UniProtKB/Swiss-Prot annotation:
The lineage of its organism: Bacteria, Pseudomonadati, Pseudomonadota, Betaproteobacteria, Neisseriales. Belongs to the PlsY family. GO terms for biological process: phospholipid biosynthetic process. It is found in: Cell inner membrane. Keywords: Cell inner membrane, Cell membrane, Lipid biosynthesis, Lipid metabolism, Membrane, Phospholipid biosynthesis, Phospholipid metabolism, Transferase, Transmembrane, Transmembrane helix. The chain crosses the membrane at residues 2-22, 51-71, 84-104, 114-134, 159-179. It comes from Neisseria meningitidis serogroup C (strain 053442). This is Glycerol-3-phosphate acyltransferase. Probably interacts with PlsX.
Amino acid sequence: MFNISAVAVSYLIGSLSFAVIVSKYYGMDDPRTYGSGNPGATNVLRSGKKKAAALTLLGDAAKGLVAVLLARVLQEPLGLSDSAIAAVALAALVGHMWPVFFGFKGGKGVATALGVLLALSPATALVCALIWLVMAFGFKVSSLAALTATIAAPLAALFFMPHTSWIWATLLIALLVLFRHKSNIVKLLEGRESKIGGSR
């Protein structure tokens, strides 16, 4: 019972779309109506509001971190299994991608996935963050950086995560993020993906 409740709460936390919330607070257009149409930090940055983009990034990462950390703190008192923690991690990302509070139209999950990984394994999250930074500064293409870091996540998890269920969860998280980036993959292959801060 507690396992199911933990997963449900994690999904609801993940469903808080900070791109939409922050944009509304600053009186900006809904990020789903301009640029790529994705409610995420990169698209909010296209509005020219760097502070709003930064807050979106922090909020989306924080909700993944909080959802999983909360479950880990309560794991022993509530008798949550390691598999339940893995499910909680997935639920936070699913909530971000298909949020119940915003018509199931969510983001691509990069920041939230990073927050989730930070709660499961700081070392895994650090590896992914470093790869993202190197690729982002080197190529100035956010999606390429995200895809590279995403592919690296399950490999890093093999070395740093203590439970098999968490490694499988990381693999599923990576597959979901890759799925949500399918249009970006096409643009990358066609050489028309926008640069960080670009208008497309």
